[in-house]
Regions:
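Hydrophobic structural segments
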Residues: 1-263
Length: 263
């Protein structure tokens, strides 16, 4: 089985028209003729992920995010960087092929990234107010207890929370990656999201939450981090690929959280 065979099966099973002009969902290292010994899905193909995948005998990596630190994986802008030289040399020496899956994952309905994140957070479908809304109603709790539960579930080292920890909340809006739901929605108490700007947003920044807390209005924001919010979706991706690629092992190799907080 070659990497091209795997990609062809992905295209056949993805369930949405393939974006032929995509610059994201393409080969980033190696190519379609590369023989595949195993497949690793991951949030992003860091050097550590690549090294662990190779150690596990998985030479095809399917990351959701970039490999060479820019959205287009444009090697022209990094060619003189010593990290690029070492990374591409390691990929080449170990016959590793990298094929990104980003746009078509988000095009799918339901979106694997949301399925995985909701599952990891314990937000069952029975709690979702409407299919595909990513809005959930849970038994009332405090923002502090909810944040502690989220931290435990995702294993985050650097979880960030805005809002009064004693605020009573039950209505959650989920966003993954760069998705930034508006926290001013009257039907939302807490936004749980991935990556978030801190200023200049449109009702999607922590200042609104701080003002709500000062006025005694229950609002909260829990920021997981981009990779943390989407990694569970790459487990869903691995399970999906296993459904039509049975010749080689397919599993998640976690990129993990890039940030940490000093104690």
């Amino acid at each position: 089985m070659t990497a091209g065979d795997v990609v062809e099966r992905i295209r056949k099973n993805v369930g949405v028209p393939w974006r032929e002009a995509t610059y994201r969902d393409t080969f980033k290292a190696g190519g379609p003729a590369t023989p595949v010994t195993g497949i690793a899905t991951t949030a992003f193909a860091s050097f550590d992920v690549i090294r662990r995948a190779v150690a596990e005998g998985l030479n095809m990596i399917v990351p959701h995010e970039v490999t060479f630190w820019n959205d287009r994986d444009d090697v022209a802008v990094v060619k003189g960087d010593p990290l690029y030289t070492q990374k591409i040399d390691f990929l080449t020496r170990n016959n590793v092929v990298v094929f990104r899956m980003h746009d078509h994952m988000h095009d799918q309905r339901p979106d694997f990234l949301y399925i995985g994140s909701a599952r990891e957070l314990g937000l069952d479908a029975k709690h979702e107010t409407a299919p595909g809304s990513h809005r959930f109603t849970i038994p009332e709790t405090t923002l502090g207890r909810l944040a502690a539960d989220v931290k435990k579930r995702v294993g985050a080292r650097a979880l960030r929370v805005a809002g009064d920890p004693n605020a009573r909340v039950s209505r959650i809006q989920l966003g993954v990656g760069y998705a930034t739901p508006s926290v001013n929605d009257a039907a939302v108490d807490v936004v749980i999201s991935g990556e978030q700007q801190e200023v200049d947003g449109g009702f999607d920044n922590p200042e609104y939450v701080l003002d709500a807390a000062a006025l005694g209005i229950p609002k909260g924001w829990i920021m997981l981090g981009h990779a943390v919010s989407e990694e569970a979706g790459m487990l869903e991706m691995a399970q999906w690929i296993r459904g039509f690629v049975t010749e080689v092992p397919v599993r998640l190799v976690k990129a993990g959280e890039p940030f940490w907080a000093p104690k």
